[in-house]
């Protein structure tokens, strides 16, 4: 999977490639999708959400340029797959998921695979996780029409936030934004399609 789907498409960071080899994606998908667990496509995980395709996960992780000393926040942690990948690349990972059932599933799976440096919360990811800020990097695993204000405030100076930018049911653009003393520096990466960011008014936890 890693060579054909990820490395040949330009992902070169050896730590990211090793993470994609070692994190068992099949444990994060439903039983009905086991046969496609290593296919390079998103798969439904219930509640209108998906586990992202491996190439996109790898590309997002590589773009953050993690060295192993960072504190990373994931907004929309879903079943926990991205958090598991990030856990091999960062010092500490924090994930916030709005849907209670997915949150509970992620807690179980991450415990099973031994991700001891991941902390998960059930709540509104659009509010970030202020108790653990500042973060060196933030991942939005859901599409937004702009950078959510609270996570941006919780991002350390020089930190990076990566997110799919665009409206639901439209092709979005994956962008990387670096926080600078003068504001921000944006890198546009590729077209993507993600489920939209949901807030607590859509589904209380």
Model-based region annotation:
Residues 65-185:
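Conserved nucleotide-cofactor-binding alpha/beta core module
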Residues 26, 35, 44, 183, ...:
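Active-site/binding-pocket entry motifs
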Residues 1-6, 42, 124-126, 131:
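Short, compositionally biased strand/turn segments
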Residues 28-29, 38, 43-45, 129, ...:
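Short clusters of hydrophobic/aromatic residues that line enzyme substrate/ligand-binding pockets
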Residues 3, 7, 32, 37-41, ...:
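Conserved alpha-helix/loop element of class I SAM-dependent methyltransferases that forms part
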Residues 184-205:
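Class I S-adenosyl-L-methionine
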């Amino acid at each position: 999977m890693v060579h054909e789907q990820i490395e040949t498409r330009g992902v070169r960071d050896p730590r990211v490639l090793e993470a994609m080899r070692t994190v068992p994606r099949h444990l994060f998908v439903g039983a009905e999708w086991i046969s496609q667990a290593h296919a390079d496509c998103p798969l439904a995980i219930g509640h209108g959400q998906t586990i992202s395709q491996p190439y996109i996960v790898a590309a997002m992780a590589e773009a953050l340029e993690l060295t192993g000393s960072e504190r990373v926040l994931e907004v929309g942690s879903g079943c926990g797959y991205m958090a598991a990948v990030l856990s091999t690349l960062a010092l500490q990972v924090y994930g916030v998921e709005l849907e209670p059932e997915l949150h509970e599933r992620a807690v179980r799976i991450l415990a099973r695979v031994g991700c001891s440096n991941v902390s998960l919360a059930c709540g509104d990811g659009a509010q970030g996780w202020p108790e653990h800020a500042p973060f060196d990097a933030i991942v939005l695993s859901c599409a937004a029409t702009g950078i959510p204000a609270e996570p941006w405030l919780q991002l350390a100076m020089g930190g990076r936030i990566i997110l799919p930018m665009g409206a639901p049911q439209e092709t979005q653009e994956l962008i990387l934004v670096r926080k600078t003393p003068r504001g921000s520096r944006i890198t546009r990466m590729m077209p993507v399609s993600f489920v939209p960011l949901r807030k607590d008014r859509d589904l209380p936890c």
